[in-house]
């Protein structure tokens, strides 16, 4: 299991416990930290995926949004 999978598993365990019996202060802090770390990781991965996407219409024209093209161009110029 990856670290992300373990974090999701623990987040789910804490969510279930919260519904059933409640969480201690320490568990609530852990839940908040795990959720924050998960969201940061998700957003980073999603951003990378979007920034590496090229949109082509049925006629074969590149219709990638200009904002994405600008980000890709800046990234490519750095390398």
UniProtKB/Swiss-Prot annotation:
Region called Disordered, residue ranges: 56-79
PANTHER family, A to Z: UPF0291 PROTEIN CBO2609/CLC_2481 (PTHR37300), UPF0291 PROTEIN YNZC (PTHR37300:SF1)
Keyword Cytoplasm: yes
Biased composition (Basic and acidic residues): 64-79
Record GO cellular component, one term: cytoplasm
Family: Belongs to the UPF0291 family.
Disulfide bonds: none
Name of the protein in its database record: UPF0291 protein SAV1341
InterPro entries: DUF896 (IPR009242)
Keyword terms: Cytoplasm
Pfam families reported for this sequence: DUF896
Species: Staphylococcus aureus (strain Mu50 / ATCC 700699)
Principal subcellular localisation of the protein: cytoplasm
Cross-referenced SUPFAM superfamilies: YnzC-like (SSF158221)
Entry's localization field: Cytoplasm
Protein origin, superkingdom: Bacteria
